[in-house]
Amino acid sequence: SGVKVYDPYHPKARDIYWNYLNKGIFQLGMDGWWMDSTEPDHFNPKDSDFDRQTYSGSFRSVRNAFPLVTVGGVSDHQRALTRDKRVIILTRSGFLGQQRYGSNVWTGDVGSSWDMFRRQITAGLNFSLTGMPHWNTDLGGFFAGSYNNSLGGGTATKNPMFHELYVRWAQFGVFCPMMRSHGADAPREIFLYGKAGEPVYDALVDAIKLRYSLMPYIYSTSWEVSHRNSTFMRALFMDFLSDPKTWNMGSEY
């Protein structure tokens, strides 16, 4: 957007970044961070942009680690300031080892379609296999604008085609490390999708209630993840390695 990003590879830059976050947000009281665009988002880049020098070398050579050092800087500073609040950072990008900073990575601004929904299962499994257990997806997809016009009359909140996709994605989200509804083009508040006694509303409420009923299990699994290097989403071959049929199975876990 014409704004030069900071150099997160430099410890002094991370200090400055944290000072702004601490004074403007953390000291006011908050439960967790939502750090978007940690790729970083880069509009209309020129090839020469990637040759700019950072504290650790050219941006081209270290750019993939941008989310690691950015998220790590916030996590380290918060933990140095207080141990009374666990670090949780929702972020759009990841790098190997980032799990140690309490980060939860989502699949980004994906389209609202059945094909993209199908791909989320594979994405979650592959991501978990890298050693990063905390993963999630925008329920219903992010870009839902097509359901406001070309794929049916009216708005997405009134469009049966989006209703079905949103409900099924929400039901999948129940069994993900984090269940989180978010997106553009269509609001996601469940009260906009009907009322008690109506199928879409009731299905969304049932999914949310089921998620809450699983909290003891999720909390116990979180302990296993943290202390025994476990994971939430387990590809079938992790438990049935001797069965070749599980090796390329990306539709269940």
Cite the ranges covered by each PLM segment.
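Catalytic-domain carbohydrate-binding cleft regions of carbohydrate-active enzymes
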Residues: S1-Y253
